[in-house]
Amino acid sequence: MQNTQKTAIVTGGSQGIGAGLVKAFLDRGYNVVANSRNITKSGAFEASDKLALVDGNAAEAATAAKIAEAAKGKFGSIDALVNNAGIYFSKHFTDYTVEDLRSLVSVNIEGFLFITQFAIKQMLVQKTGGSIVNITTTLVDHPIAGINSAVPMITKGGLEAVTRSLAMEYAKQGIRVNAVAPGIVDTPMHKNDPKDFLKTLQPMGQISDVKDIVAAIVYLTEAGQVTGEVLHVDGGAHVGK
């Protein structure tokens, strides 16, 4: 266990990768601010003086402000941010609607934009650097026949692009910006999907566990010389199938 006395923000923190990440950061001695729409009612975490829970839609600027204020007010800093909140749904390209596009942009792009702006502003004030990790998907780099995801990839591909841009923009200030690109992960998103089929989508023939993704995020959060990196944790899916 580390005793970093640093503060990490995790959006989409009530289940799956987000919940696993909150627990991992707490185990490593971080103060943690976790957000989801109803996280205070989720029952996912034991009470801790090192944990603050903030309800609300991360796609709204007001919620992002509340999250940032919770980190600064309760713990005094923002040292790490993981933009884990996101949505995905599969349709044929011609079936996506304007409402679908707006939902994807709202959560995946605006949800990233507002809280990341608050985090970077605070990191610049602190002058001690910081870490931002975005969550994308291996489908950005390697589309799979039968997995129709063109419109969601507009947003996820955008996150990969902005990851590299921000890494360059803030490198001299010690603010590192990276991304993790998972493949198929054993989370509630896939609870109704046939497991045997899901295993065929990754060359290693396995479904990734939440802990695999969490380990990658923690690594990037703490890897002081890594920035602008997109780390694939997908059983080789980004290489081919």
Q: Where are the model-predicted features located?
A:
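Conserved NAD(P)H cofactor-binding loop of Rossmann-fold oxidoreductase domains
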Residues: 84-89, 236
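C-terminal substrate-recognition "lid" of short-chain dehydrogenase/reductases
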Residues: 175, 209-233, 238
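Alpha-helical segment proximal to the catalytic Tyr-Lys
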Residues: 121, 164, 168-172
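Substrate-binding pocket helix/loop in short-chain dehydrogenase/reductase
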Residues: 92-93, 100-105, 198
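Conserved glycine-rich cofactor-binding loop
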Residues: 14-15
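Active-site loop of short-chain dehydrogenase/reductase
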Residues: 5-6, 77-78, 123-137, 147, ...
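Active-site helix of classical SDR
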Residues: 116, 155, 163
